Amino acid sequence: MADTDLFMECEEEELEPWQKISDVIEDSVVEDYNSVDKTTSVSVSQQPVSAPVPIAAHASVAGHLSTSTTVSNSGAQNSDSTKKTLVTLIANNNAGNTLVQQGGQPLILTQNPAPGLGTMVTQPVLRPVQVMQNANHVTSSPVASQPIFITTQGFPVRNVRPVQNAMNQVGIVLNVQQGQTVRPITLVPAPGTQFVKPTVGVPQVFSQMTPVRPGSTMPVRPTTNTFTTVIPATLTIRSTVPQSQSQQTKSTPSTSTTPTATQPTSLGQLAGQPPGQSNQTSNPKLAPSFPSPPAVSIASFVTVKRPGVTGENSNEVAKLVNTLNTVPSLGQSPGPVVVSNNSSAQRTSGPESSVKVTSSIPVFDLQDGGRKICPRCNAQFRVTEALRGHMCYCCPEMVEYQKKGKSLDAEPSVPSAAKPSSPEKTAPVTSTPSSTPIPALSPPTKVPEPNENAGDAVQTKLIMLVDDFYYGRDGGKAAQLTSFPKVATSFRCPHCTKRLKNNIRFMNHMKHHVELDQQNGEVDGHTICQHCYRQFSTPFQLQCHLENVHSPYESTTKCKICEWAFESEPLFLQHMKDTHKPGEMPYVCQVCQYRSSLYSEVDVHFRMIHEDTRHLLCPYCLKVFKNGNAFQQHYMRHQKRNVYHCNKCRLQFLFAKDKIEHKLQHHKTFRKPKQLEGLKPGTKVTIRASRGQPRTVPVSSNDAPSGTLQEAAALTSTDPLPVFLYPPVQRNIQKRAVRKMSVMGRQTCLECSFEIPDFPNHFPTYVHCSLCRYSTCCSRAYANHMINNHVPRKSPKYLALFKNSVSGIKLACTSCTFATSVGDAMAKHLVFNPSHRSSNILPRGLSWMSHLRPGQASERVFDWSMKNTYLPPPLVPNKAATVKPVGVTPAEPQELAGPVLQALPSPASTATPPATPTHPQPSALPPSATEGTECLNVSEQEEGSPVTQDPEPASGGGGGSGVGKKEQLSVKKLRVVLFALCCNTEQAAEHFRNPQRRIRRWLRRFQASQGENLEGKYLSFEAEEKLAEWVLIQREQQLPVNEETLFQKATKIGRSLEGGFKISYEWAVRFMLRHHLTPHARRAVAHTLPKHVAENAGLFIEFVQRQIHNQDLPLSMIVAIDEISLFLDTEVLSSDDRKENALQTVGTGEPWCDVVLAILADGTVLPTLVFFRGQANRFANVPDSILLEAKDSGYSDDEIMELWSTRVWKKHTACQHSKSMLVMDCHRTHLSEEVLALLSASSTLPAVVPAGCSSKIQPLDVCIKRTVKNFLHKKWKEQAREMADAACDSDVLLQLVLVWLGEVLGVIGDSPELVQRSFLVASVLPGPDGNVNSPTRNADMQEELIASLEEQLKLNGEQSEEHSASAPRPRSSPEETVEPESLHQLFEGESETESFYGFEEADLDLMEI
């Protein structure tokens, strides 16, 4: 037994109510969970020992007789009937076998050392026993068995020597210590197998057998240490019947699938009878007759309970032992007889016989006729809910079929009598009122092959890790909250009066104040853990805690619930057993009831799901507030010393009642682990802290003979049996099917990419990873999965066992356009998209693929017969690598370009792939992160070469050698294209020093290759929509969307929704194009928004148009307002170069100035308000259409809205005596109480545009706002070139900006029709016919408006290039289509070697990049 194992047992009391097989649960059976704290597991093997024991001569009982005798203990009685000593023995026999065979197996039970038991007593009398016998003719049998001795106090067995018959040996001598409760034991030996069946009751404790004489040994394995981490106890008995006898029958009687604990108890009836009372029935007609199966050696099934008396009943114990030696019913019987404290007589026969039991005690079936069975694995369930939950995991496709028309209740149950394969194998069954047919445990549709079911009698075992058993998470109502639009609420800090834009920033700001106090010395923070907020006595203890608990490396001795580390795994397991419950989730989000066993998951959940809401989360006790002042006061009170820490988790509370309520409500099992759902009671569950094999406890030669050592080793080696999803019969069928596949020739495994020389060895069985949802039949793929994903080490030690990928093979999903060459990537895609049924195998890189019609390639399956005649060359090594789990993403382009270009060779130097594929080191990422291709690793991978080059046919000649290289862009080019999509083509050209036409050409090439090369939808559809919504919201707030921020957000969403995914530039470019996220799209109103964003937009349009109609609002009272923030980099402005980059419209800090634009639905442009951070005394030339406000400290969002309402809006509404409507976004502080009060005072109805919808339904975003920003950019760049060497400060720049704003506002003000049509395009106003225009019509209008305004502002030349970049042209100019490879061939082919040597590699690199 390993010190790192924790044995659990799936018992009836621990199951959910719908999982219980029996509908009636007696109160006396229910146990306290804490009653398993002091138990141990003992594994015992019957071995020959050098001590003889005389075996009593058994009397023969002949004739047809059925007897039932009940004798209860006549000693001192205890009020608790469950503590009385009661032994129930039931034996049934048939006409062909004896009730007692020669050399039977007696069971000797003692409680105190009787005086007469110095040597084995042969003829005592049994008092507390009930015997049910059904004997027929007595015949002799050569089968011998072993006696079993169970004692409670030092039972002295002397002169224990083998008898003359070598087959009759001592079986077991167990010693139960005084004062300990005894768990009922069920012993079921079967030929050549092991059987373990503890029943429901109190735990059992066995101690080491104390020898009477020095040197004598007992076959009981001693405990090697005093620390035990195993519960509850199990007892394993092995039979010593020769294999020649056990093989006489093909099917071994077994009751492993029928739990004894679920049978109705009859113990109360037996124990309640007066002492000595007997009930005899001698009607020979009730004796059934059974066929004669071959004789097997079995042991009687005995339930022993601890009596309430000790020394004075030693005579009774002696009588008990003597009677056990004389009662004939203790001999052999043709089938195992089960007797326990809560079950009646049961008899199980093999599939080839039918059984009838006659008894005066009620007899129950092993399973009733109402059971439901799984149609795939034949697992049996009593209630439909349990079967449905099992089928959702076992056979989900059948569940879908059931939902379409067939009910689960119509599932056929197990037949009571299976159809026989031959008439000789089934005996006639006489139906009587007292007989109950016992159906076969599995339908005997096919006789199993020899030795295939050798291990079927082994009891069900399940091996689980601590993470699976104790930890879990529950989604709560988080999914329901995602449909509601998020509205950011600003909070003002009471310490520094700073206003934070949303709740998460306010929470971080409060933590920052505490850190400042600690740095200033106001609060002692040298002994406070900044992760779990615990107080330590010394800094050294804090340092040890940080290294052991909060390090990034996984540890098998760290409790993730309470975040404590332990010295060893046994101590850790003991802590888990004593402190925590299975499925305990004490950390709860009070907003949506999301809960988890890990604090970090709840914290990440709140920051992601409840961002931009009014909720504030206390990091100390997870209490949620809606008021900023209350949150601040509560937060600061946690900094005091008098807080109440929970000793079962990391939370701390301000009041004792909160702590008590927390412990009562949350420190209990919230939901049982999914692996335990549907398990039968009695299943042995082994809990392990680590993933390694359990260590074998050595047994010295002085404690046990050599035979015992071998048996103990055999038992230990069979302990960690894997969990199979199919029953043994079905596994054997699968193995036979795999063996038949070997005749198909040599094949290649799609999972590990290796050839399959031997199918049975390569696909040994279907295994399921206990740590995740990974399942496979490939042994190499399973080993690689465990090495890469579940081996806790600080640095990668082993390379992956995968090859690069199968050459020429590609997998295409039959339900969508997803295609990949990595089998695991396709498996993950199918898992995350359950509606996608299957995938097809396609050849990749073949010349005829480009001539197939759309959809034709997905229907054609690759023929492996082509392998001998057509072999594609090996592929380029994978560009595999991904983001680190801590959130490290590729750096900014300017930081990466230098070292990457220096470290990477040129494209021409990597035209020939290496002969041996390189294997990338596995990173500490989720499984999907290390799979696939085309991901950037700037430290190892080649960025200049194409990511994947499609292989060309070997016989294709050299004419088309350059075609495949043009299919996909290199990583360098993809980075440039991604930059252009995040910003614009002009900025990308300036940043990477590439012509804009070349960037647009790369973009067109990438768009053209999308139809044939859809290699990477790495995120699910739901995750991509969430990421697209984030991009739209970032753009609305003028926050940066670049390579770094995009990859960081994608990683965060991928980890939270899917457990991780891989990142590549190709995926990023496709994502931006797939969701139309280019910043300067001219038909944005026709693009599809994410699902719930589009729903919010529809609700907004419906609300606005209904209010306009109901309130009869005039067009002059419908206003749209939006802000434009300008960011100034003063350092760049004062420098001599790059001055054009000083003024930006995207940034994260405080804006240099804010421009508030406002337009009316009748085409009027209201005065524009400009807020400048600084002094504006010298500015006298301010245009009439602009109002300037200046202050050194700047203006807050509330102040901006207040000044705009006072200086602009109230002046406009003063002469209008009508209600009005204000269209604005939900960002900044537009929804604060102050702003809403201002609007209410002016009778203005706020129409708030939902987050992410501004590009489609905000009138200013449709045309005007983007044009104003482009015009300012153009003017400043022209001015920066003119004053490159001249000095320029912010005051001069402000004067220029005011002039440019006046110019652009004048143009807009002269085009009232353009302004009015902006409201129509945004669907704020209905169309001329009263209905909303179609998206296509609105897109045409938007494109026309943008073109008209740009033409007036002379922006059409530059923006036409932008437009050409977003839409591919049908035919490009010859200058743009010329490639460096073609020029290289041209000059080298037509020039003399002496006169021209071709281009240098560096020149080619510059031409391409």
Curated annotation (Swiss-Prot):
Coiled coil regions, renumbered to chain: 1336-1364
Domain HTH CENPB-type: 1011-1081
Major localization listed first in the record, in broad terms: nucleus
Cellular component GO terms, alphabetical: chromatin; cytoplasm; nucleus
Compartment(s): Nucleus; Chromosome; Cytoplasm
Bias type Pro residues, positions: 914-925
All copies of domain DDE-1, residue ranges: 1113-1319
One Gene Ontology MF term: DNA binding
BP GO terms, sorted: cell division; double-strand break repair via homologous recombination; kinetochore assembly; mitotic sister chromatid cohesion
Residues with PTM Phosphothreonine: T436, T460, T1377, T1393
Cited PROSITE patterns: HTH_CENPB (PS51253), ZINC_FINGER_C2H2_1 (PS00028), ZINC_FINGER_C2H2_2 (PS50157)
Span of the signal peptide: none
Superkingdom per UniProt: Eukaryota
Position(s), cross-link Glycyl lysine isopeptide (Lys-Gly) (interchain with G-Cter in SUMO2): K319, K356, K419, K446, K486, K626, K674, K797, K879
Post-translational modification: Phosphorylation increases its interaction with PSIP1.
Function: Plays a role in mitotic cell cycle progression and is involved in kinetochore assembly and mitotic sister chromatid cohesion. Probably through its association with CBX5 plays a role in mitotic chromosome segregation by regulating aurora kinase B/AURKB activation and AURKB and CBX5 dissociation from chromosome arms. Promotes the repair of DNA double-strand breaks through the homologous recombination pathway.
PANTHER family tied to this protein: POGO TRANSPOSABLE ELEMENT DERIVED WITH ZNF DOMAIN, ZINC FINGER PROTEIN
Protein's name in the database: Pogo transposable element with ZNF domain
Name of the encoding gene: Pogz
